[in-house]
Structure formats: C-alpha cells, structure tokens
Amino acid sequence: MDIIQTIMDVLQYVAMTDTVRPPKGVREAAALGLRLRERQPPSNRAGTPVGLARARDLANGRPVSYATLKRMKAYFDRHEVDKQASGWRPGEEGYPSKGYQAWLLWGGDPGQRWVLSELRQAGLVDKDGVTL
C-alpha cells in the first residue's frame, strides 16, 4: 500500500467517525414526522424501528456520524420517488401518507439538503451527489 492510499484511508476513517449536529430545520422536520405519526391510526403509522430511532435522534439534536449521514443519503436516494405518490401534500387524499411521514422522520427535505452538504464538505460525495 502506498503512502497516498494510506493517507486517503485515514482521512476517510476520520470523516466517518466524526460527528455533526442536525440544524434546526432537520430537527423540526423529524419532530413533525413524529407528531404526525402519533396522530395516525395504527394502520397508517409510518416508520421502521430504525427510522423512528433516527427521528428521535434528529429531533433531539443528537450528534450524527458521517457513516449515518451516508445511510441517510441512501434512504433519501431510494425514497425520492415517494414524493410523487398521493398523500404527500396537505389536501391530498391520504395525507399524511406513510411515505411522507417516513420522509419527515429522516429529516425531510431539510435533512436531504443537509446530508448532501455535509457529505460534500467531507469529500464523501462528488459534485453530482454520487457517494464516493
């Protein structure tokens, strides 16, 4: 292994173990997701155990590791398409949909923007948002 690769590996390790705190908009979105979920009948409650834990951490402003930010990015990438479903916006039938609730639990649109910004600054995604 050459010295450059070793340095790159160390930098990536540091970036993955360092933590950042979610900004206000992310905390508010996660808290809203928890409130909306709580008001739903059990049959319309969204959120896996992982998503609920993430929401509680975000809503409470707990530090988030870069490894977790990468997992959050993967969630947002997979579920971006959910925004096209019915029940995403107030006034639509089925609002708030399970997809909308879950999106908020992960920090919502502010969370998506924050995650991408943090990962870009850490050099963990490229300029197009592709995870490195």
Question: What are these model-predicted stretches?
Answer:
Residues 3-132:
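Extended terminal accessory/targeting regions
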